[in-house]
């Protein structure tokens, strides 16, 4: 309930085919993250705002857990955007966004962003040989020696784009940059609109529950003010009384989308 379905499918169905395994824990429990780390663990991952439960990730504490075990913390900040949350300032090492959503703002492109804070020492242990050992594809270059904390993002560009085709079209990049120009203004309105609708639904007799960290009924209401001081996001989930049939009726009755 706290991980985007596409990400779960990538971890569980795609990466598992090439030998990667994933252990899942509740985002509110840093101790559980610590207990789940194994000798072969390479990365700790979480979403600033879980999808669809909207749980708020305790970035500082989970970053401390990851770093204590010599691991980087990767955070998906798609729902939060850089306007509402700065994960690197809170301890994350890597941040990813689906730029299709709030960053571009118009739903006309498909793209993603990876941000490397340059905070992780890839030479600190032997868990990352692709960065700490010679790479034949670049004349035995050792990325971590040559580029230091920027080794990850450099290899992502030099190898990932070159060999795996993750190269954004120029027009797509242009449209995302255009969207970024209005991100602060749009997020302010997105946040206020979402909270207004969530408050309305919370009082509606046909609604069983609403999950949004901006509501006092949400378990992370107070904590969200620390991680997301400018607003608890513009996405919420809700459950209807009447189950699946009630959901069908609601969707088919919508006149404005």
Question: Across the structure, where does each feature detected by a protein language model lie?
Answer:
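Conserved PLP-enzyme active-site core in the AAT-like
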Residues: 1-206
